[in-house]
């Protein structure tokens, strides 16, 4: 099923990650809607299934960004809500995601 099948009525995607981001040792596309943060992936070759992690924006009470590593830096965003979601990837891809989440949470 495509992501659109999992969106709520009148829910609009405001940001989509350019490349997959790592969360819990799995790769996901990240979407920020006007209501939720959604991590979405299609898994399997023959028996396809959807893998979704979702957090309501109103439940998020903290967003943290950090970079580590030399010479190859890795960026991490920690989103604190009902649980903590730690997403990793290259800084050039993670920073725009951080700013998008931060602007939607502070909205």
Enumerate the predicted regions with their spans.
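Anionic N-terminal interaction surfaces
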Residues: 1-32, 94-107
């Amino acid at each position: 099923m495509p992501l659109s099948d999992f969106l709520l009525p009148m829910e609009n995607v405001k940001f989509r990650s350019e490349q997959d981001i790592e969360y819990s040792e799995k790769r996901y596309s990240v979407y920020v809607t006007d209501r939720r943060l959604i991590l979405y992936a299609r898994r399997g070759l023959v028996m396809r299934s959807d893998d979704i992690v979702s957090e309501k924006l109103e439940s998020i009470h903290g967003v943290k960004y950090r970079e580590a590593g030399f010479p190859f830096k890795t960026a991490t965003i920690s989103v604190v809500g009902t649980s903590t979601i730690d997403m990793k990837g290259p800084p050039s891809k993670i920073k725009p995601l951080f700013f998008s989440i931060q602007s939607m949470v502070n909205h």
